[in-house]
Amino acid sequence: MFLNDAHKKLINLKGKTVGEILTQFESRIKEFKINKGGIGQMILLYLGLPLDSKLTDFDDGELKTNKTDKDGNSKETIFITQISSIIDELIGEKSKDFFQSNLFKKIKNVALVGICKDDKDFNNWKFTYFYTFSFEKNKKLFNEFNNDYKTICEQLKNYIKTSKDNFIHTSNGKYIQVRSKDSKPYHPIYSKKFEKYISNKNHAFYFKKDLTKFLEKLK
């Protein structure tokens, strides 16, 4: 399924509760965890898509969900992709070009759905916003992403050279950041380039909360 094919259904989520959406189809997900991807999986099933391990959710793009307050303001950053398998593409003498990177492939066409999870009963969780952005339609934004990517790569390299532990640490651009994403037992990142571990935990790219503020103004 292409993202445009899902556009109408995704727009119609805004203002509805999880319970209202669940009544529209037979869910194979028995319970929803706030941070375990349940809502994203529910939306894919709502759209008639399979739950598989493809690089992107749609044939031409990716679905992301974001926890918000009741007014649609982001309460957390938005996970994009882990970096352990591509670390040397980021910290090599010449980092891989952003427009050829795994990061670009993951974000070149994105549908972003906000959901307020303040109620203890997940049936009362309410969808608060729906945004889309793409490389095709938002060239200026992707120039910012490119700048963020370059800035983050330089910060990661600098941390390895100058930090006390010679590990990477949280690195920020304007709309994108790299920070730790892991749970015990931790998964340190090994760099073949440096022939050593360059972190004590796994790390990942995230969209910062500032991105949704920008997208709201862009509407």
What are these regions (language model features)?
Residues M1-K219:
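Nucleic-acid endonuclease domains
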